[in-house]
Amino acid sequence: MIPTYMNIMLAFTISLLGMLTYRSHLVASLLCLEGMMMSLFIMTTLIASNTHSPLINIMPIILLVFAACEAAVGLALLISISNTYGLDYIHNLNLLQC
């Protein structure tokens, strides 16, 4: 396997392990999720540049749009929770309450 692909898969795996390990803090979870999205973006960009297919060239752009939307929603949620409760611990929050 090419070392570039191995490094990108390693970055995705480390971000996934960070997401599973630091799931009690919202900031850490959002950063790990962003790392996963960026490694997926780089991987799809490399695959799209190697295949030279016009249909797959739009995939990295779509993934980047989803990553930007995820970051915006996550940041808005973080600001809302920290303004309301004053902390970012996920296990202390029960967002299903009316």
Swiss-Prot record:
GO biological process: ATP synthesis coupled electron transport
Entries under Pfam families matching the protein: Oxidored_q2
Family matches, as InterPro entries: NADH_UbQ_OxRdtase_chain4L/K, NUOK/Mnh_C1-like
Domain of life (superkingdom): Eukaryota
TM helices/strands, residue ranges: 1-21, 27-47, 61-81
Enzyme class: translocase
Effect ascribed to mutating T44A: In strain: Isolate 661nigra
EC number(s) stated in the UniProt entry for this protein: 7.1.1.2
GO MF terms held by the record: NADH dehydrogenase (ubiquinone) activity
GO cellular component, one term: mitochondrial inner membrane
Record keywords: Electron transport, Membrane, Mitochondrion, Mitochondrion inner membrane, NAD, Respiratory chain, Translocase, Transmembrane, Transmembrane helix, Transport, Ubiquinone
Subcellular location(s) per record: Mitochondrion inner membrane
Catalytic activity of the protein: a ubiquinone + NADH + 5 H(+)(in) = a ubiquinol + NAD(+) + 4 H(+)(out)
Role played: Core subunit of the mitochondrial membrane respiratory chain NADH dehydrogenase (Complex I) which catalyzes electron transfer from NADH through the respiratory chain, using ubiquinone as an electron acceptor. Part of the enzyme membrane arm which is embedded in the lipid bilayer and involved in proton translocation.
Similarity-based family: Belongs to the complex I subunit 4L family.
Description of how the protein assembles with itself and partners: Core subunit of respiratory chain NADH dehydrogenase (Complex I) which is composed of 45 different subunits.
Protein name as annotated: NADH-ubiquinone oxidoreductase chain 4L
UniProt source species: Macaca nigra
Lineage per the UniProt record: Eukaryota, Metazoa, Chordata, Craniata, Vertebrata
